[in-house]
Amino acid sequence: MAKGRPREFDPDVALDQALRVFWKRGYEGASMPELTRAMGINRPSLYAAFGNKEELFRKAVQRYVEGPAGYVGKALAAPTAMEVAEKLWQGGIDMSTCPENPSGCLILRGSMGCGDSDRLRKELVSLRAMGERRLRERFEQAAAAGELPEGVSAADLARYVLAVMHGISMAATGGATREELMRVKELALKGWPGHSVTG
């Protein structure tokens, strides 16, 4: 009998399934039996391929950032600060209301439910802080180009955009419809610094 049977699962597919469980349940709420069942593997195979639960969660977060939340990087490349905000909010709506996705934001949900893993919570908070820094730097560029009204703080604007994003995520988790969230986005855009509403 041959030794070393080949793995009978696709690690990418298994990681996608783990991502969905963490996204739906959060880190603390995702049990090992639920994870192994969703991934279609046993515990030894999970540990061999992905490490422990904490390491699996880190890999799932990376997959989330590169996949479903990949719209963030594209939004930051938009030509104007207002378009950056619009694309971030629209991306959040699209992701949160897609029937194929669990609602809400994995990183927000994960950072609020890491249980005893203080190290993991700090990593997620650091990830969110990095996102805020990138957004602030983008708005600083816009301010230097004369795109924002004088006196508008790039840091405050970044916090505002993220607060709306987080609100969209939480509202979607609470059952808000796509149409309702689109109205929230349009209302937020009307309050953009220097944006004049005509009609």
Label each region the model flagged.
Residues 2, 13, 21-55, 59:
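Helix-turn-helix
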